[in-house]
Regions:
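N-terminal glycine-rich phosphate-binding loop and ensuing alpha1 helix
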Residues: 1-67, 97
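Structural beta-sheet core signal
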Residues: 5, 51, 125, 150-153, ...
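Short conserved AdoMet
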Residues: 19, 46, 65, 118-119, ...
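A generic fold-level signal
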Residues: 20, 90-92, 105, 184, ...
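Well-ordered alpha-helical segments embedded in enzymatic catalytic cores
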Residues: 36, 109-112, 211
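Conserved beta-loop-beta/alpha segment of the NTase-like Rossmann-fold superfamily
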Residues: 62-168
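Catalytic-core segments of class I nucleotidyltransferases/pyrophosphorylases
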Residues: 121-126, 131, 136-144, 155-161, ...
Length: 257
């Protein structure tokens, strides 16, 4: 199965960190948060990634092009124009980086990678700025069992995200960003059928609006309830919080060894 990760946004609320790099390349524990998200998926056996690039996408391309320089010790033989990598730390990943435009919205970015996912039975989809101890394997199995077009992970963070009305796993209503009312919210980890691509109207389409609302209205959106840790990195305060968890060895999203 493939995982599509949105990595093209400006990250305006993290402007201190994103003036020279896209938000998913902001580091936690010396590694881009994008790396942490990919490690989460990889710990569940998902190693084929489609990265939706946009703002300063070349930074992401350069990171993967020089991955071993970031991860390993190296020796440069200047005379022979040769580089030797020591203790090469490879990941079992296939990474496809797609330029989805500087100004495309979330739905538009997903539509722009359609050629890479249209023949899949299902695929994972998430944002490049949130981590958690989600049971991705169980979410995929839940999606296969109910047979609907879309599954999202529902969780309980602060009330500034899209609230869900859930009945026996089925999402009856999707409301974007209400003021906190204690409802479960969209945690941003999806399993989707390629049929959802038909609901995206173009580059200006916001995934969290017409497509998700329409899926809920058509009884095609299901929720896998997550009771554990989830944290988006929207602000500098969020970044500091994640850094503290990582530095103390208390990062719940670190499900790999």
């Amino acid at each position: 199965m493939k995982a599509v990760i949105l990595a093209g946004g400006l990250g305006t609320r993290l402007s201190e960190e994103t003036s020279s790099r896209p938000k998913p390349m902001v580091e936690v524990g010396g590694k881009p948060i994008l790396w942490h998200i990919m490690k989460m998926y990889s710990s569940h056996g998902i190693n084929d990634f489609i990265i939706c690039c946009g703002y300063k996408g070349y930074v992401i391309k350069e990171y993967f092009a020089n991955y071993f320089l970031h991860q390993s010790d190296v020796t440069f033989c200047m005379k022979e124009n040769r580089m030797e990598v020591h203790e090469e730390r490879a990941e079992p990943w296939t990474v496809t980086l797609v330029d989805t435009g500087d100004d495309s919205m979330t739905g538009g970015r997903l539509a722009r990678v359609a050629d890479h996912i249209k023949d899949e039975e299902a695929f994972c989809f998430t944002y490049g700025d949130g981590v958690g101890d989600m049971d991705i394997t169980a979410t995929i199995e839940f999606h296969k069992q109910h047979g609907k077009q879309a599954t999202l992970t529902a969780t309980y963070p602060p009330g500034r995200f899209g609230a869900l009305d859930i009945d026996n796993g089925r999402v009856n209503n999707f409301k974007e960003k209400p003021k906190g009312d204690g409802a479960m919210i969209n945690g941003g980890f999806f399993v989707l059928s390629p049929k959802v691509l038909e609901r995206i109207s173009g580059d200006d389409c916001v995934w969290e609006q017409e497509p998700l609302i329409g899926l809920a209205e058509d009884s095609e959106l299901m929720a896998f309830e997550h009771q554990g840790f989830w944290q988006p990195m929207d602000t500098l305060r969020d970044k500091v919080h994640l850094e503290k968890l990582w530095s103390k060895g208390q990062a719940p999203w670190k499900m790999w060894t």
